[in-house]
Structure formats: C-alpha cells, structure tokens
Amino acid sequence: MLEVWKKWNVRGVVQGVGFRHFVKNVARAIGVRGYVKNEDDGSVTIVAGGNDEQIKELFRRIMEGNGWSYISDYDEIDLPKQEYKDFHVEF
C-alpha cells in the first residue's frame, strides 16, 4: 500500500489538556508513525505517516478530541516519506 505522510498544525484548546498523549496513543493503536509536539504559540504540530485509511482515521480521531481538547483551526501539508519507526511525543 502507498504510504501517506501529513503534517498538521492544530490550534484551539490543545495544550494542557492531555492532547499530545491522546494523539500518541491513538496513532500507536492504529499503527501510524511520526510525532506530536507543542509549539511556543500554543498550537500543536503532528507529523504522521501510514496508509491512507490510517491517516484518515487518525485525523478523524484528532478532530473528535479527547473530551478536553477542542480544535478551532488547522493547517495541513502533504509531506514526502519520513523515516520514523514509531510514534512519539517530541519536546
């Protein structure tokens, strides 16, 4: 299957609410690789790779949130293949 890589920068209530660990747990559960990272401006960056279905499922779950997070806006960029072996939180 063709590998898809996306970079999302999400804004809203996404820091201080367990969002990064939520994203990490969802990504690992569905087999996506990459990372999630808090940014200084209060947004969160997510780089994720997997097959098309995995990426769509991750995005759907991210937009649903963890019950405390709320995404008001986001940017999406297609990326070339990245070399991550797992999904982790970057600091």
From Swiss-Prot:
Entry-linked InterPro entries: Acylphosphatase, Acylphosphatase-like_dom, Acylphosphatase-like_dom_sf, Acylphosphatase_CS
Enzyme Commission numbers on file: 3.6.1.7
Database matches in Pfam families: Acylphosphatase
Keywords from the named record: Hydrolase
GO molecular function, one term: acylphosphatase activity
Enzyme class: hydrolase
Protein name per its UniProtKB record: Acylphosphatase
Family statement: Belongs to the acylphosphatase family.
Protein's organism: Fervidobacterium nodosum (strain ATCC 35602 / DSM 5306 / Rt17-B1)
Active site, renumbered: 20, 38
Catalytic activity reported: an acyl phosphate + H2O = a carboxylate + phosphate + H(+)
Residue span, Acylphosphatase-like domain: 5-91
